[in-house]
């Protein structure tokens, strides 16, 4: 009898994309993008199972050919997190297990980031975790770069597109604010993932367009893990060349 599984990695992969239709199937070094994400994720020793979650038969067929476990989900979901929840339900994930939402457009993801992300769950009180990295004052000016401020216990106080914390007197003698940029990788206890999908979109979530604020507004703490690793997502077709170079550098 096999040991019970306690940590699942789920990769949401939608075919539809306004900026890059069919992105999960984009070829990178002879393989579709989703395969590279799966290959990186399965190198994380914490996972008992890694699976793709898709609404598209073309992606599912390609996954089957390559031997990538795949779960078919409904076509329409409010967010990738909702798709991950449906896949976790179909996989029969127990309430106390950890589910990691692995972005499907991160083919150069460093598996060590995933190890860091799931480490806090050794503490039974942790329900949700995410990652953050140091930001310069210049990087923090962009509203596309989400910032997070963290309490002394390591839990998130707030996420914002604004430059937080605001340094009233300016960064005299250098960047002294200790700004942190949020990395959009999340790990949930299954019960917290279910709770998230049951909650309606919150006021601050709709204002900032940041779904993690739904958790904070409803009293669900998010543990923030600092990392020195950076992500390199694919938003547009022209990003593929950058990823190819990164993969060749890292794996060559």
Curated annotation (Swiss-Prot):
Pathway involvement of the protein, from the record: Nucleotide-sugar biosynthesis; CMP-3-deoxy-D-manno-octulosonate biosynthesis; CMP-3-deoxy-D-manno-octulosonate from 3-deoxy-D-manno-octulosonate and CTP: step 1/1; Bacterial outer membrane biogenesis; lipopolysaccharide biosynthesis
Main location: cytoplasm
Disulfide linkage: none
An MF annotation (GO) of this entry: 3-deoxy-manno-octulosonate cytidylyltransferase activity
Compartments where found: Cytoplasm
Keyword set includes 4Fe-4S: no
Superkingdom of the source species: Bacteria
Cellular component aspect of the GO annotation: cytosol
Entry keyword set: Cytoplasm, Lipopolysaccharide biosynthesis, Nucleotidyltransferase, Transferase
Enzyme Commission code: 2.7.7.38
Matching InterPro entries: Cytidylyl_trans, KdsB, Nucleotide-diphossugar_trans
Function: Activates KDO (a required 8-carbon sugar) for incorporation into bacterial lipopolysaccharide in Gram-negative bacteria.
Protein name: 3-deoxy-manno-octulosonate cytidylyltransferase
Organism listed in the record: Nitratidesulfovibrio vulgaris (strain ATCC 29579 / DSM 644 / CCUG 34227 / NCIMB 8303 / VKM B-1760 / Hildenborough) (Desulfovibrio vulgaris)
